[in-house]
From Swiss-Prot:
Belongs to the TAF10 family. GO terms for molecular function: promoter-specific chromatin binding. Component of the TFIID basal transcription factor complex, composed of TATA-box-binding protein tbp-1, and a number of TBP-associated factors (TAFs). The gene is taf-10. InterPro entries: TAF10. This is Transcription initiation factor TFIID subunit 10. It is found in: Nucleus. The TFIID basal transcription factor complex plays a major role in the initiation of RNA polymerase II (Pol II)-dependent transcription. TFIID recognizes and binds promoters via its subunit tbp-1, a TATA-box-binding protein, and promotes assembly of the pre-initiation complex (PIC). The TFIID complex consists of tbp-1 and TBP-associated factors (TAFs), including taf-10. Essential for early embryonic development, but not required for transcription of some genes; probably acts via activating transcription initiation by RNA Pol II, as part of the TFIID complex. Disruption phenotype: RNAi-mediated knockdown causes arrested development at 90-100 cells and inhibits differentiation. The two E cell daughters (E2 cells), which form the endoderm, divide abnormally early, immediately after the MS2 cells. Phosphorylation of the RNA Pol II large subunit C-terminal domain (CTD) is reduced slightly in embryos. Abolishes expression of taf-9, perhaps as a result of altered protein stability. Reduces expression of a range of genes, including let-858, rps-5, hsp16.2, and pes-10, but has little or no effect on expression of cki-2 and sur-5. It comes from Caenorhabditis elegans. Its main location: nucleus.
């Protein structure tokens, strides 16, 4: 009984009601093994008959439209549209500041669209850092509430900023005379 290849049901009702225990792939029986499930069981019959049906017209149209959409690659069109719209977008970090830091990093004569994209990426990075710092301040309860209002104001401290910058892989070095 312990040998999986020698498993045989003890009675004829067991072969109809219970499937054999799950076996690893290398213990699987050959394809000519007797059928365990009854041919009268409706759920098995329904599954078998529905497996080999051809697709309906609506299903074929859906598959065709899906293939066309995948082949068009709309994300590439969206990317080109986004890059072209960068010229109309006034960045928070001015182009002159971005160009200065690009030149100091050794990048010369970059495309204005690339400059805008780098400016936008820097803005996103800074906003993520500040959002994380504010979330940390809220979790620590460092806000101040005035008596007349219910608004809580949070102050961004260097200690909070140091924690968040370490998470992002930046090191905030303070001058020795800083208190």
């Amino acid at each position: 009984m312990n040998d999986p290849e020698q498993y045989e049901p003890s009675s004829s009702t067991e072969s109809v009601l219970m499937p054999p225990p799950a076996l690893p792939q290398y213990f699987q029986r050959p394809a000519a093994a007797p059928q365990v499930y009854s041919t009268l069981e409706p759920s098995v019959q329904n599954l078998r008959s529905s497996l080999h049906k051809p697709l309906t017209g609506n299903q074929q149209q859906f598959v065709q439209k899906t293939l066309e959409n995948v082949q068009k690659n709309p994300s590439q069109d969206d990317t080109h549209e986004f890059i072209n719209q960068l010229a109309d977008y006034p960045p928070t970090i001015p182009d002159s500041v971005t160009l200065h830091f690009l030149k100091s990093a050794g990048v010369d004569g970059s495309d204005p669209r690339v400059t805008r994209m780098i400016s936008l990426a820097a803005q996103k990075h800074v906003s993520d850092i500040i959002l994380d710092a504010m979330t940390s301040a809220r979790m620590k309860g460092l806000g101040q509430t005035k008596k007349g209002t219910k608004d809580t104001k949070y102050t961004l401290t260097e200690e909070l900023l140091d924690e968040i910058l370490k998470e992002y892989g930046h090191q905030n070095t303070r001058p020795p005379y800083h208190t």
